[in-house]
Curated annotation (Swiss-Prot):
Keywords associated with the record: Ribonucleoprotein, Ribosomal protein, RNA-binding, rRNA-binding
Family: Belongs to the bacterial ribosomal protein bL20 family.
Annotated gene: rplT
Origin superkingdom: Bacteria
PANTHER family tied to this protein: 39S RIBOSOMAL PROTEIN L20
Listed name of the protein: Large ribosomal subunit protein bL20
Entry's Gene Ontology BP terms: ribosomal large subunit assembly; translation
Cited function: Binds directly to 23S ribosomal RNA and is necessary for the in vitro assembly process of the 50S ribosomal subunit. It is not involved in the protein synthesizing functions of that subunit.
GO MF terms held by the record: rRNA binding; structural constituent of ribosome
Cross-referenced InterPro entries: Ribosomal_bL20, RIBOSOMAL_L20_CS, Ribosomal_protein_bL20_C
One Pfam family, short name: Ribosomal_L20
GO cellular component, as recorded: ribonucleoprotein complex; ribosome
PROSITE patterns given in the database record: RIBOSOMAL_L20
Amino acid sequence: MPRAKSSVVSRKRHKKILKLAKGYFGAKSKLFRVAKQQVMKSLMYAYRDRRARKREFRKLWITRINAAARMHGLTYSRMMNGLKKAGVEINRKMLADLAVNDKNAFAELVEIAKKNL
């Protein structure tokens, strides 16, 4: 019985990796071994940064809320404490959006927070 060669499977596997490596610089997009290493590293970065993105956005929202709250004479932590005591359940994403796009509504929320401190 002749030896079974895996040329079709190998070609398919190589094409799959090289397709994922498209756009990489130099040998990383041309040579299978180097491309495979870079694709593995890229997938690791993607996995890590999908989690980091959530932290980065939360930091951004908090920074925006803090800046807007300080313009009204309140710190971020005191504002959040006041809103919590008032029973206002609005998340940081929405608060940051209001701080940027609807300053009047944000000012009303600041007043609510001040009353409940």
